[in-house]
Amino acid sequence: MRIGLFAVGRLKAGPEKDLAGRYLDRFAKAGPAVGLELARVVETAESRAANAETRKREEAGQLEKALADGSLLVLLDERGKALDSEAFARLLGTLRDSGKRDLMIAIGGADGLDPALHARADAVLNLGKMTWPHQLVRILIAEQLYRAVTILSGHPYHRA
């Protein structure tokens, strides 16, 4: 299964981008052994619309353009379901085994995600009850993707 990461906003050069890149590289190298590969990272500019609803709608339009036909969609949202690392790995394994070729994991903008995306999503997850800056969310999901691959492959990186 090809996994893409969609993010509203761009990571500037610096330690956050380096760390996210390091985990995505690890995922890209280890993932094929368990049938997961990094397809792409899509960054889109934040909408400059005057109100939050319009911004969310415009950002959702950018995500829809980035989705492959028939792609699965997982949203990262504060109102989503919290999973531990092993449950996240199981979810990725289940989605991989669904027969779908593509999965997009989406990080919304500062205003959140459009309700239409929630209706279309195959899963909505959160990374805990705390609010995280988007730069750190990228690092966290990149690390969790790598960790999921190590769990699925039985690698000792994850020591529960």
Curated annotation (Swiss-Prot):
GO terms for molecular function: rRNA (pseudouridine-N3-)-methyltransferase activity. It is an enzyme of class 2 (transferase). S-adenosyl-L-methionine binds at residues 76, 108, 127-132. Its EC number is 2.1.1.177. Signal peptide: none annotated. One of its GO terms (cellular component) is cytoplasm. It comes from the Bacteria. It is found in: Cytoplasm. It catalyses: pseudouridine(1915) in 23S rRNA + S-adenosyl-L-methionine = N(3)-methylpseudouridine(1915) in 23S rRNA + S-adenosyl-L-homocysteine + H(+). CDD domains: RlmH-like (cd18081). InterPro entries: Alpha/beta_knot_MTases, RlmH-like, tRNA_m1G_MTases_N. Keywords: Cytoplasm, Methyltransferase, rRNA processing, S-adenosyl-L-methionine, Transferase. Specifically methylates the pseudouridine at position 1915 (m3Psi1915) in 23S rRNA. Homodimer. Belongs to the RNA methyltransferase RlmH family. This is Ribosomal RNA large subunit methyltransferase H. The gene is rlmH.
